[in-house]
């Protein structure tokens, strides 16, 4: 004889922990630590200026893709801040490095154009155009650099800005999520190019105004 249980059916629900804009805070802390640790690893050395580019700069976009714009920017910023404190030889102006990291994470997180933040790319693009204008304008109008030389000298920054502003940012996000390994590789290359270019632009404009 079987007896059916009576009473209200119970359901087990997993409680979410603390989050930053939907991203678990543990992820934010972990990836910020990764960025900080990679500050010790040189990616390239600039002999003329006596400084090096740390490998942490290569993962700024990756953090934004994983965590999203807000949490990604926070993790990159905190990681970069800790990085310049423990590896000061990798920066010229700490504030510039941190600002560049924050903007790279924010831009990378805004690439897919989905969700309630699908429109964030627009004000961010306007801000980046202003930053680029200040950067190139300082060279042309204050320091007398030929406009074509200023554009060629900032070609990485300008191309990254165009790739972000144009619908190519959506294409890059689609390729990153593709099951095709070749498309993923192209998306990773272009996405890293965009993030690195935006990071450099936002950091360089501060450095350029301070020293020029």
Model-derived regions, located:
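Loop-helix junctions at membrane interfaces
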Residues: 1-212
